[in-house]
UniProtKB/Swiss-Prot annotation:
This is Large ribosomal subunit protein uL30. GO terms for molecular function: structural constituent of ribosome. Part of the 50S ribosomal subunit. Belongs to the universal ribosomal protein uL30 family. Gene3D superfamilies: Ribosomal protein L30, ferredoxin-like fold domain (3.30.1390.20). Coiled coil: none annotated. It comes from the Bacteria. PANTHER family: LARGE RIBOSOMAL SUBUNIT PROTEIN UL30M, MITOCHONDRIAL RIBOSOMAL PROTEIN L30. The lineage of its organism: Bacteria, Bacillati, Actinomycetota, Actinomycetes, Kitasatosporales. GO terms for cellular component: cytosolic large ribosomal subunit.
């Protein structure tokens, strides 16, 4: 199964509270933090919510 490397590239300062909560639930705490998650619809939805704050790469 494919995996996603999610990196926070922009600050959440000034963002809505639900965007901050989504970043926290993805495991991103500060700028340039990266996490690797399973490629599942739940994580795709979270990434879609904060797509303006993160970059996503597929990792094998």
């Amino acid at each position: 199964m494919a995996r996603l490397k999610i990196t926070q590239t922009k600050s959440y300062i000034g963002s809505k509270q639900n965007h901050r909560d989504t970043l926290r639930s993805l495991g991103l705490k500060r700028l340039n933090d990266s996490v690797v998650k399973e490629d599942r619809p739940e994580f795709r939805g979270m990434v879609h919510t904060v797509r303006h704050l993160v970059t996503v790469e597929e990792v094998d």
